[in-house]
Amino acid sequence: MVNTQLKILRVFGPTGAEVSSVLRGIRDDGCPGLRLLERDGEFAICVQVSAPNRAMAEQYCDKWAARLRAKFGDDVFAEGETSLAQATLDALLEKRKLLVAVDEPTGRLLGSLLQPLPHSEAVFDFGTESYADPQKSRRITVPEQLLRRFPGDIVQAAAGRALAALQVTGADYAAAYMPASVGQCPFVLVCDRRGAVACALPPDMNDTFIGNQILDLLRRRLFGLQLTDSCITFRPGHDRPLLVVSEAARSRGNTVRFSLRRRTPPTRDADHTADFEPMLDFDRPAPVSPPSFPQPEQSAAPDPAAPHRTLH
């Protein structure tokens, strides 16, 4: 009896073209079943392998998954159904770190991704101790000396404001999003006690993509992982490298929504229409749909007993 095993790697950072190039190489090396899905910059790479028994199928599936992990390196953030938001939240909880946003637009981007997840209030203040507090918000400003030294530098200004947010709140990380301005592409930035890291963004990205970029930048900073080509690191108030979108990222196209469950016939009720959408199929034979995954349940209300620290 043939046994089939499926493993799903979750990836964030490369473009669709870069991911596709890697998968074509893996396919040409003999991987029997590959499926690529994408949503708001997150990729799900499905490896499906069949063998005469379960042990062999698991061995072959693990082999190809390990090959893919080696190819994508620090771009792999999880396996299975774990989203980038959940993976970053888990890392913050594990390391007992606190995150704040410098302003309401940035807080909204992060809050929309983190709020549905249990225990998110233990690591993110949702503005209550930062931009939504009138007294503290007035203190989260760009230092005057930084403005004088780098007049008109939007990146330095964002870093200075993030540094002020750290000092005002006592948090470990402060995040900022800046839309496009004259002479500067849109970017996201994360600041901690060591300095700042910023990532340039392609134009016309949706809010979820931008929020994911902040979370990925934070994830890489938390674990000391390699940054993407569109990122720079610097100390606020000191000279910095030029922040531009990498050549590969400029060709990034629009995203396609997906969930890890099989497509169902469309209905008029959006709540009962699956949004599984294959982006590319790398199988040589007829494509085989991945097994059905249950619809994720609505997350429960935050646990008041969850471990947390108080912002100052």
Specify the residue positions occupied by each region the protein language model found.
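Accessory alpha-helical/coil subdomains and C-terminal extensions
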Residues: 1-41, 61
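Broad, structure-driven detector of short, well-ordered beta-strand segments within folded domains
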Residues: 34, 175-179, 278
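Short acidic-glycine loop/turn motifs at beta-strand connectors
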Residues: 40, 51, 191-195
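Terminal amphipathic helices with adjacent charged low-complexity linkers/tails
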Residues: 43-58
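Short alpha-helical segments enriched in small residues
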Residues: 56-261, 312
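Long, low-complexity, intrinsically disordered segments
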Residues: 260, 274-312
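Short linear motifs centered on serine/threonine within intrinsically disordered regions
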Residues: 263-265
